[in-house]
Amino acid sequence: MLLELERVSRSFGGVHAVDRCSFAVRQGDIHGLIGPNGAGKTTLLNLVSGLIQPTGGSIVLAGRRIDRLPPHRIAALGVARTYQNIRLFPDLSAISNVIAGEHLRRRDTVLESLLLLPSARREQETARERARALLARVGLLERAEERAANLSYGEQRRVEIARALAADPAVLLLDEPTAGMNPAEVSAVGRLIAEVASQGHTVLLVEHNVKLVMSICRTITVLDFGEVIAEGPPAAIATSPAVIAAYLGAKP
Amino acid sequence: MAGGEPRPTETGSTPVDHRYDASLSVNLQDLRDFFLTYQSVIGFAGINGLLALSVYATLSCGQLSLANAGFMAIGAYASALLTVHASLPFAVVLLAGTVAPALLAVPLGLPVLRLRGVFLAIATIGFGEVVRLGFVNWEYTNGALGLVGIPQRAGLGSILAALAVTLFLFLRLRGTRTGCALEAIREDEAAARTMGIDSTAHKLAMLTLGAAVAGLAGALEAHFTFMVSPGGYTFGRAVDMLVFAVVGGTAHPLGPLVGAAFLTALPEILRAAGSSIGIPPGPLRLFLNGAILLAVILFLPEGIASLWRRYGRRRVREGHAA
């Protein structure tokens, strides 16, 4: 297991946003995380990426506890993410956003640049080339120089995925990557996620589009009111009475 | 394109060269007069340029620090004391004036950089005032009177050289791994952290760099004006530096320099222009000074330096239309 959550809890005041959640993500899997609004999905991603700390339980990545580490250390261990409410750097160009995402892969130093060493320029060009390749992969090469704030919603989501991939992460956390997209864009992102997973990145996918989740995930965890109510392969989840009750309401 | 044409300059070269020579020597003479007349203005513009860059250092990672008048005071006093009490070479004195505030920036930054926005600004104002009041009450440096009669060791050469070195540093930072990380922190610190950027370390480094540059400016100013006194390092001074940077624009390191040069020269320009068109000296010119400042902030929110970019963009657009 690459990522293991063991009885993870997080409460805000009296609200148990995440309550003793336990589940594990297998290496190379596309693991879906679904649940009604307010089930605690985004809180869980914030806990895994270190933006907030759990009030209980443990999170283990590749055998190492990460639940008390600051976000940049967790990122260095191989966790990258996108955000439900898109957090691109609005004033930077699309390509500069992706280049910023390469921070963990770059090795150039300020000193090299100050000494006008050719290696500094070379590294910067390599970073730019890699970013161009990633933008091409999400189909946005021709928008590379556009300010992120000027991109359409769907384009911004794709740049954010490219930026997360720029770190070459072991685990990619995607928070509703298809929200606000049209069906054609949704299926393109679905194909992209499948391709990313086939290249060895493990994906933890929070998504409201059930059709997409059912078609690309191998394992699905269902949250409701901060608790895991079901887990298993898509076919089992689709017929689980607990899941149907959570989404549609229980029969009286 | 010009391959088939004879070169006209080669045939009648002597008279043409002569004319150019004459005009060149006149220009050089004008230039020398200009430099001699405005030596101090240029010197102060250079010092203010350094101060503007010192604020730009923290602004470039999105932090509003107003501690730089305090750092400047430390650089000024440290260097002045070394000059007066130990006859060290000027380069060593300048180095000490640069390093001393930088060393202090680290213990200041560790607790203070946990604060954000206006809270950071207020905490750093506090630091500046503590430094200033410390010097007011320090008998060794003559308290509020300060040190006078410091030998003049800084001139246009050393000021402009310091400015060039500092500007070079900021220019070379752009596009490096660190430079990209600073931009990311400025735009969205939390997002930057989840990309593996240690925001605290970067913010601390820039606060320290800003302190070093402010200290260098303080050391140069002390040896340019022969004196240091606590009154030169007030909260108002910290705000002045911020205004230079903001008026010039903080998108590029040249912006703060443009702002500092513009605002340092503005009173001189107004004096020259004012006496030629009959505006009397005094409050009216101060009013004009303020009005121009306000106009820049209102109509060029990205700073004077953005004019150049706007012009460039318009030319591109016209080029596409044509």
Model-identified regions with their sequence ranges:
Chain B
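Transmembrane alpha-helices and adjacent helix-loop boundaries
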Residues: R19-A322
